[in-house]
Amino acid sequence: MATVHYSRRPGTPPVTLTSSPGMDDVATPIPYLPTYAEAVADAPPPYRSRESLVFSPPLFPHVENGTTQQSYDCLDCAYDGIHRLQLAFLRIRKCCVPAFLILFGILTLTAVVVAIVAVFPEEPPNSTTRNYCPEGEGIYSRLQLVARVCTTKAIYVTKANVAIWSTTPSTLHNLSICIFSCADAFLRDRGLGTSTSGIRTAGGLARTTSGDALFCISSVC
């Protein structure tokens, strides 16, 4: 009958175990292996701390069998690996989950803001014709409105009419805006240029006006 002496860590009294009667012919006695819960409960403080990744010496440094000393590094590695996985999971749950929730909230809020801006644009839709010349409104404010609406479009200005044409070749939308004779001076003062021969859009449309000067505000579009 074989007797096995082993210590869970240096400095603790060895534990003596005796194998069962049918184990006399076993060359290497099988030591008692505690469960993981027992090992962690009996381990030094670094093992019991679930927030630390610093580990003490192996739980099973050696097993004595007479004059033979055998190493159980593989078992030590297995226990350390399990413990490291548990600590890693706890750290992920403690740190990464709140960070993920915060990031998800920021992305959701950004998506909501973008959706609101897309549904309620500042400029009026190009698919409808609308009169921007109510009675009593000055010419300066009307031209300011033209400059705000003309994003990514070419604008043609005559002394009597302003038309906004989309630069998309497939669709040309016209917003009729009445402009009086001071449009000429307004555009010249701001260096936006004049033309009397017509201006060609990206869609291939040429527009000429006989008897009236034609002005383009494409520089602000």
From Swiss-Prot:
A motif (PPXY motif) lies at residues 44-47. The keyword Membrane applies. Residues 1-22 are annotated as: Disordered. It is found in: Host Golgi apparatus membrane. Its main location: host cell. It is a single-pass membrane protein. The keyword Oxidoreductase does not apply. Keywords: Host Golgi apparatus, Host membrane, Membrane, Transmembrane, Transmembrane helix. The vaccine strains V-Oka, VariVax, and VarilRix harbor a mutation in the stop codon that extends the ORF by 92 aminoacids. Interacts with host ITCH; this interaction probably mediates ITCH degradation. Belongs to the varicellovirus ORF0 protein family. This is Membrane protein 0.
